């Protein structure tokens, strides 16, 4: 079973790794993730259809979003009962966000040869009577019931197409009502950052298990793909997990982690099938694809672990099926929040090839 993030359309300063010599640009080394002061928010006076999550009762008012947020580097496209927000900068970088699921389905960047390439891998499947989009980047949490997860709703957008576009989404947990969840998606010239923020508004401590921000990176083939900068990092082999609608659902009979060890290679080839949690890894490392002559710097804040999955060579080379899954997680150690405390975790995808 492969790790899969998916959503349903019809329902509503990074230190360098110890041995890596790849330099990060100064803009990536210190990314301000607080929301701009000139943010435009959806006020309470807005009709329910404009601010409610996508559902048959309250469909998103796309025309309102277009009127309210024009000039902020964002456009909106209606796709049934949900909406795609397209973030774009003047340099050509762009990202597509599925609003109700908080899922990034596309991240395109300008590279050394002057063209643009897609960094994320997504695909569409028909499941029963519904269309399902898999892959991309999305957050997930361990739970027993996908119905406990509510849709993300747009809170506001700030910035402009020249320097940075930021979008804030919010969501509530139907099971743990004391938790306030925020997701801030920031598109800069060469970096896409996804920040997940959780606030304990209750009076008792809480624990969140199985949190992750995993990205599906498109590659030419796993044989040509390498993770650079992980030498000396401790890891634990584990079975792939399956996030459904933002819920991490593990294989119950195989949930316990297996063999552990230390990464021996600083140039780890991802040609073999693997599902691994790195428990002691640098805050940033690089994924190189020799086939596409491309690379991505994967960075994190807040999270202590890095999850990595490769389907190995069983996938046909140089097709739309080739991908690797990489991102920060807390699959082994839950996130503990005292009353009134805030936790934040960030995934950075940086393009060093422009």
From Swiss-Prot:
Which organism was this protein described from? Arabidopsis thaliana (Mouse-ear cress)
Q: List the disulfide bonds.
A: none
> Where mainly found?
plastid
- One GO molecular-function entry: catalytic activity
Phenotype upon knockout is: Impaired chloroplastic NAD(P)H dehydrogenase (NDH) activity, probably due to a reduced stability of the NDH complex.
Keywords of this entry: Chaperone, Chloroplast, Membrane, Plastid, Thylakoid, Transit peptide
Gene Ontology cellular-component terms for this entry are: chloroplast; chloroplast thylakoid membrane; membrane
Q: What is this protein called?
A: Protein NDH-DEPENDENT CYCLIC ELECTRON FLOW 5
Gene that codes for this? Answer: NDF5
* First and last residues of the transit peptide: 1-49
Give the subcellular location. Plastid, Chloroplast thylakoid membrane
Domain of life, per lineage:
Eukaryota
* UniProt-listed GO biological process terms: carbohydrate metabolic process; photosynthetic electron transport in photosystem I; positive regulation of gene expression
Q: What does this protein do?
A: Required for both formation and activity of the chloroplast NAD(P)H dehydrogenase (NDH) complex of the photosynthetic electron transport chain. May function in assembly or stabilization of the NDH complex.
């Amino acid at each position: 079973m492969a790790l899969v993030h998916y959503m349903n359309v019809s329902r509503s300063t990074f230190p360098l790794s110890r041995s890596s010599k790849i330099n990060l640009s100064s803009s990536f080394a210190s990314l301000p993730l607080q929301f701009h002061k000139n943010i435009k928010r959806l006020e309470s006076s807005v009709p329910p259809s404009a601010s409610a999550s996508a559902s048959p009762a309250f469909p998103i008012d796309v025309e309102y979003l277009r009127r309210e947020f024009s000039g902020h580097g964002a456009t909106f496209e209606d796709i049934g009962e949900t909406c795609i927000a397209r973030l774009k900068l003047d340099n050509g970088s762009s990202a597509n966000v599925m609003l109700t699921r908080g899922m990034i389905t596309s991240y395109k960047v300008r590279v050394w040869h002057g063209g643009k390439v897609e960094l994320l891998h997504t695909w569409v499947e028909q499941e029963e009577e519904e269309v399902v989009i898999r892959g991309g980047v999305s957050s997930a949490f361990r739970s027993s019931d996908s119905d406990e997860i509510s849709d993300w709703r747009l809170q506001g957008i700030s910035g402009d197409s020249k320097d940075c576009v930021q979008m804030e989404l919010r969501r509530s947990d139907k099971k743990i009502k004391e938790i306030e969840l925020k997701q801030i998606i920031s598109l800069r010239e060469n970096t896409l950052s996804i920040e997940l923020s959780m606030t304990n508004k209750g009076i008792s401590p809480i624990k969140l298990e199985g949190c992750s921000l995993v990205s599906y990176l498109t590659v030419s083939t796993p044989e040509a793909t390498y993770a650079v900068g992980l030498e000396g990092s401790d890891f634990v082999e584990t079975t792939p997990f399956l996030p459904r609608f933002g819920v991490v659902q593990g294989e119950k009979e195989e949930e316990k982690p297996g063999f552990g060890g230390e990464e021996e290679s600083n140039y780890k080839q991802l040609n073999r099938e693997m599902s691994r949690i790195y428990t002691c890894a640098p805050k940033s490392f690089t994924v190189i694809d020799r086939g596409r002559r491309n690379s991505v710097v994967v960075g994190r804040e807040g999270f202590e672990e890095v999850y990595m999955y490769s389907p190995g060579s069983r996938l046909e080379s140089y097709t739309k099926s080739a991908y690797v899954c990489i991102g920060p997680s807390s699959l082994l150690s839950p996130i503990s929040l005292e009353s009134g405390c805030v936790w934040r975790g960030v995934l950075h995808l940086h393009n060093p090839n422009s």
